[in-house]
C-alpha cells in the first residue's frame, strides 16, 4: 500500500496475499506470474503493526492505528466482509492456538477468546503488564510470553493457571499443543530476564 507505515506483515491465504495498512484499504490479491488480480479491497481491516491470524477462511486482527484503535475484528477472507467487531480492546496483537485467540491489548490486558466467526466470546481476561504493549503474545513450552515497550518480559505459566473450579490443562498431541481453557481465572506471572 502507499500508506506512511506499512508495518503489518503480508498474510497468506489460499495461495493469495492479504495486504493492509492502518490508513488504507486492506486487499486480497492473487499473483498470476508477473501480474496480480484483486480479489477484494475494502476498509474492513486496516492494521497498523501486528498482522493478525488466519484460521480456516477467517481472519482475526486489530483494526486501526496503534495509538487510538480499539477494535478487534473478524473478516471473511473469501469475501472481505466483516463477521463481527469487538470494541473496547485497545489496539491489540493476536496469536492463536487450539481454536482460541490469545489477544494482548495495547494497555497490557491479556484476553482469551473463542476463534469463531459467529461472535466474539471472551473466555478469560487478566491484566498482565503495565505500559505500552505492541508485540504479539508468543507460545512456547507450555507458556505464553508477553512484553511491553520498556522491555519487561513476562512468562505466563499456563499449566499453573489458578482457576475455579478447574485448572488449565495443556497436552501435547504429537508436536501440537492442545489447551483446555477455563471460563475465568488469574494468570500466574513469572518474571524472566529480558
What spans do the regions from the language model cover?
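Structural motif
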Residues: 23-30, 67-73, 108-113, 152-159
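Short, composition-biased motifs enriched in small/polar/acidic residues
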Residues: 160-194
Amino acid at each position: 500500500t502507499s500508506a506512511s507505515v506499512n508495518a503489518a506483515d503480508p498474510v497468506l491465504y489460499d495461495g493469495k496475499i492479504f495486504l493492509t495498512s492502518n490508513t488504507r484499504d486492506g486487499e486480497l490479491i492473487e499473483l498470476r506470474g508477473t501480474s496480480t488480480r484483486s480479489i477484494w479491497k475494502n476498509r474492513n481491516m486496516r492494521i497498523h503493526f501486528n498482522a493478525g491470524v488466519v484460521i480456516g477462511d477467517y481472519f482475526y486482527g486489530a483494526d486501526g492505528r496503534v495509538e487510538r484503535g480499539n477494535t478487534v475484528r473478524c473478516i471473511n477472507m473469501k469475501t472481505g466482509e466483516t463477521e463481527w467487531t469487538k470494541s473496547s480492546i485497545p489496539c491489540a496483537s493476536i496469536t492463536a492456538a487450539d481454536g482460541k485467540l490469545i489477544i494482548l491489548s495495547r494497555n497490557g490486558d491479556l484476553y482469551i477468546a473463542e476463534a469463531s466467526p459467529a461472535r466474539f466470546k471472551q473466555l478469560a481476561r487478566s491484566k498482565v503488564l503495565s505500559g505500552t504493549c505492541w508485540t504479539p503474545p508468543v507460545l512456547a513450552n507450555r507458556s505464553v510470553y508477553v512484553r511491553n515497550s520498556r522491555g519487561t518480559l513476562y512468562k505466563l505459566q499456563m499449566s499453573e493457571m489458578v482457576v475455579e473450579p478447574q485448572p488449565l490443562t495443556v497436552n501435547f498431541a504429537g508436536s501440537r499443543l492442545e489447551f483446555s481453557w477455563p471460563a475465568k481465572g488469574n494468570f500466574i506471572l513469572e518474571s524472566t530476564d529480558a
